[in-house]
């Protein structure tokens, strides 16, 4: 079975076929990868910077998106930092405030309406799903089929995000990873804020929507796919 690996520089993936002929020349420093096997597509992202555009010095967190039964599969492969300790919640259930623990997050945005979905996944099995409009959360704690496993110093997790959770017309995304405690708390971003745009005393803010970059569910599902209607969005 033929397997084609097409690699894209982060932020330049607006046209899935744009860099086919040039793919051999842009393997270094890529944050996004699109793999095609017959008609099954997947997108792979690597978080290589902190929120303020400093390169991470550990193995990057990898997030993979692919088609699932009734939704989008989100796979996480990451180092396990074991800091902070596990949240005091039951694995497999939503946990409010999960962003204060070790977590990997993905945001899916409609840049015109400013409506977006936030999905947070924890190595200990807890999760948190939030629906937001203009930065205001109007629904959270939605159910999610999510399983996570820790193997020594690494963890992996798989979640199935139902289509009804996505706002109509998703065209941008970003992803984040957080770990550590106190002054060692580390905030990493797929698409960080450029160093020259950071203001004095500015801290991490994952809701800076202007730094999200192009994303389409059709890159995974196919150009003829239509997003199912949702009862959760106006």
Model-assigned labels for residue ranges:
Residues 9-29:
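N-terminal signal peptide
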Residues 93-145, 150:
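Extracellular/luminal beta-rich ligand-recognition
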Residues 1-6:
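Classical eukaryotic N-terminal signal peptides for Sec-dependent ER targeting/secretion
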Residues 144-182:
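Extended, acidic-biased charged interface segments
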Residues 65, 70-84, 155-162:
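Short, well-ordered beta-strand segments enriched in hydrophobic/aromatic residues
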Residues 30-37, 95-104, 109-116, 168-234:
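Acidic/polar low-complexity flexible segments
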Residues 58-61, 68, 151:
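N-terminal intrinsically disordered, cationic/polar leader segments
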Residues 78-96:
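Short amphipathic, basic-aromatic surface patches that mediate peripheral association
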């Amino acid at each position: 079975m033929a397997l084609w690996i097409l690699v894209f520089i982060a932020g330049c993936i607006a046209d899935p076929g744009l860099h086919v002929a040039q793919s051999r020349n842009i393997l270094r420093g890529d944050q996004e990868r699109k793999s095609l096997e017959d008609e099954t597509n997947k997108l792979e992202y690597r978080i290589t910077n902190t929120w303020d555009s400093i390169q991470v010095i550990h193995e990057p967190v990898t997030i993979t998106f692919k088609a699932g039964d009734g939704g989008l599969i989100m796979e996480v492969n990451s180092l396990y930092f074991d800091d902070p300790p596990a949240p005091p919640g039951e694995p497999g259930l939503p946990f409010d405030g999960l962003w204060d623990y070790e977590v990997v997050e993905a945001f899916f945005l409609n840049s015109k309406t400013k409506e977006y979905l936030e999905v947070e996944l924890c190595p200990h099995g807890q999760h948190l799903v939030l629906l937001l409009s203009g930065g205001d959360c109007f629904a959270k704690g939605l159910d999610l089929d999510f399983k996570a496993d820790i193997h020594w110093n690494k963890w992996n997790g798989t979640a199935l995000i139902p289509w009804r959770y996505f706002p109509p017309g998703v065209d941008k995304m970003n992803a984040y990873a957080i770990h550590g405690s106190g002054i060692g708390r580390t905030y990493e971003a797929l698409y960080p804020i450029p160093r020259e745009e950071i203001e004095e005393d500015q801290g991490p803010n994952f809701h800076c929507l202007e730094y999200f970059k192009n994303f389409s569910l059709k890159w995974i599902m196919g150009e003829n796919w239509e997003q199912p209607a949702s009862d959760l969005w106006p």
